[in-house]
Design a protein with these regions (language model features):
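PP2C/PPM-type serine/threonine phosphatase catalytic domain
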Residues: 1-234
């Protein structure tokens, strides 16, 4: 049996007076599992906040066709918003394992021990350069293009989502618990800068979320969202 033990979520704009282009789906029961997600509207194109909302709404209706159906809906927007685009990273956890859908640069992590293991790959110019072994990670720190997205739910680029499955035995810790974190780039930027908290903080969803939020709020660089969830497998 799959039991939701704890969850912590937030979704804030970079500045209180501006629109938040992120949307989240806190954990929701869906058939025999739980569904949750983060969508980050792409900056630079008008209507990012509309596109991310469309993605979350379509995910709740039909996860299997969320990418194609969201694009269909975005194409129906008025001319003013014809370039509206969004990323989307979602998780659907059942007793069998984790189904992941991903496009863009939000990130999904699994906690193993006291470390977070990134399970999604960024669809960015930087990641492409890494994949092609043109630069090392260290060299790329000095290069522009970290936030240039190569695919999204968008009419402006070819849509190439990743969809994959991780068996439950690769997710569970020694207590038969599963910890999953989805972050928009405005959140994981601050986690990756210093990817550690105390052991006590790493063992608690609420403490982790509060500690990361405190770190971000000192100098946010973008809208920032987190969906952090803990499950027990009986």
């Amino acid at each position: 049996m799959l039991n939701l033990i704890a969850s912590s979520t937030y979704c804030f704009p970079k500045e209180s007076e501006r629109k938040n282009q992120d949307h989240i789906l806190p954990p929701q029961q869906y058939h025999n599992g739980y569904l949750f997600a983060v969508a980050d509207g792409v900056g630079g194109y008008k209507g990012g906040e509309i596109a991310s909302q469309i993605a979350i709404q379509n995910l709740m209706r039909d996860p299997q066709n969320v990418f194609t159906q969201s694009l269909v809906e975005i194409k129906k927007l008025s001319e003013e918003y014809h370039r509206a685009s969004t990323t989307l990273t979602f998780a659907y956890l059942t007793e069998e394992g984790l189904h992941i859908g991903h496009i863009g640069d939000c990130r999904l992590y699994i906690k193993l021990g006291n470390k977070l293991r990134q399970k999604t790959k960024d669809h960015t110019t930087h990641q492409r350069l890494l994949d092609e072994k043109i630069y090392t990670k260290k060299e790329l720190k000095e290069q522009p293009g970290k936030n240039i997205i190569t695919t999204a739910i968008s009419t402006q680029v070819e849509m190439k989502p990743d969809e994959f499955f991780i068996p439950i035995d690769e997710l569970k810790d020694e207590n038969n618990e599963v910890f999953i974190y989805i972050m928009s780039d405005g959140a994981h930027h601050f986690w990756e800068h210093r990817p550690r908290f105390s052991d006590a903080t790493m063992q608690s969803i609420s403490r982790f979320s509060a500690a990361l939020q405190k770190r971000i709020e000192k100098a946010p660089t973008d809208d920032y969202s987190l969906v952090a969830v803990q499950f027990k497998i009986d």
